[in-house]
Amino acid sequence: LYLFITYTKRGIQEFMRRPKKSKYKSVVIKKKRYYFYKITWADITGDAGHATAHDFSGFLPSIMVTHAYMFSKDRKYVRTFASYEEGDELFSDRNVFPIGCIVKMEKVTL
């Protein structure tokens, strides 16, 4: 009798198992999950002043870091947002990055 109860209890526990939680930070909006990323990207740097050849050769793009939720990604662009309205599909603090500018993308873990 004891083995039967133990077996049944284990069977119920396996049946009632919760879905595996993601180890990545995300938000669900209108049944769609958006993951949080740290995006490192190269930004254009400009200067309208006079410079020597030595100064000009040391002139490099700025390496920027953005923390945001990824809205979409395709062959040309990555679209992100940082703010949203709960319970509705409204996004703000939006950016569109050309794929060529992105140096690195990392999913943020919990």
Feature locations, PLM:
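Short, Lys/Arg-enriched N-terminal segments with co-localized hydrophobic residues
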Residues: L1-F15
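Conserved RNA-binding domains used in RNP assembly and mRNA/RNA metabolism
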Residues: F15-L110
